[in-house]
Regions:
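Glycan-processing catalytic domains of CAZymes
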Residues: 16-243
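Cleavable N-terminal signal peptides of Sec/SRP-targeted secreted and luminal proteins
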Residues: 2-15
Length: 243
């Protein structure tokens, strides 16, 4: 099983099983500019309510404030390249070359839902069409591309089963489900905010005996849950996540 903070590491348990440390960087594909995309995307993101009552009360006056690019951006730092479009191939080449030079093995691409559906992020932005561009840029830079499956309304075992059937058609970065033992290498998918869904629901999809199990099928993946708190680790085990 893989453990995740923001960097994947796997330690060799036996002398004959030496596992290379992996570094994965999350890369968001939802940015846009009027020149390339017809309007600002995500740079003008509205301020959302904080998830804890105490912090929300402190900053309630800022809720729904909308940033005003190009001078005021929804970003902790102003990009060196200025506000950019994620669908700009030259920009993607530059960013993935920087990731390669920093020693990153794979970029984890934010994905907001299947094409043709009503699924998008909270700002109404879909990223599916940009994924092939980003994968191609990652290949040119010599790094891999994994998927970061964003939450959406109604996300559960049945919808994610359809998501995986779509996502595995891409040439994604692969790892074995277990670091040692000669397991097949499978596409790597991160499930963001997995804790919003009960473990028993994920077990339907990721446990071998689940009624929707992808294990051993063409849609099988190395699936890693992203969590907020250590007390959510039971979700990883009971939901049959790989890390």
């Amino acid at each position: 099983m893989y453990k995740l903070v923001l960097v994947i590491t796997a330690a060799a348990a036996r002398a004959e099983c030496v596992v290379k440390k992996q570094t994965h960087a999350f890369y968001y594909l939802w940015y846009g500019t009027p020149t390339t995309d017809g309007k600002w995307l995500h740079w003008d993101h509205a301020v959302l309510p904080h998830w804890t009552k105490k912090v929300r009360a402190q900053y309630k006056h800022l809720e729904n404030y909308t940033h005003e690019p190009p001078t005021r951006l929804h970003a902790p730092f102003y990009p060196a390249a200025g506000p950019y479009s994620s669908s700009d191939p030259q920009l993607l080449d530059a960013h993935f070359s920087q990731l390669r030079d920093a020693g990153v093995d794979a970029a984890v691409l934010s994905w907001t839902g299947r094409p043709g559906g009503a699924v998008s992020d909270t700002q109404g932005v879909g990223t599916d069409a940009i994924v092939p561009l980003a994968i191609a840029a990652a290949k040119r830079a010599g790094i891999g591309a994994a998927i970061h499956l964003e939450p959406y309304e109604g996300r559960g075992a049945e919808s994610v089963a359809l998501d995986l059937a779509h996502l595995v058609t891409h040439d994604l970065y692969r790892l074995p489900r277990r670091p040692c033992g000669g397991h097949d290498r499978l596409p790597v998918v991160y499930l963001y905010d997995a804790y919003h869904t009960p473990a028993k629901e994920w077990a339907r999809l990721f446990c071998e005996n689940g009624d929707l199990s992808v294990r051993g099928t063409p849609h099988d993946v190395v699936v890693i849950a992203t969590l907020l708190n250590r007390d959510e680790e039971d979700l990883v085990v009971n939901g049959c996540f790989d890390g």
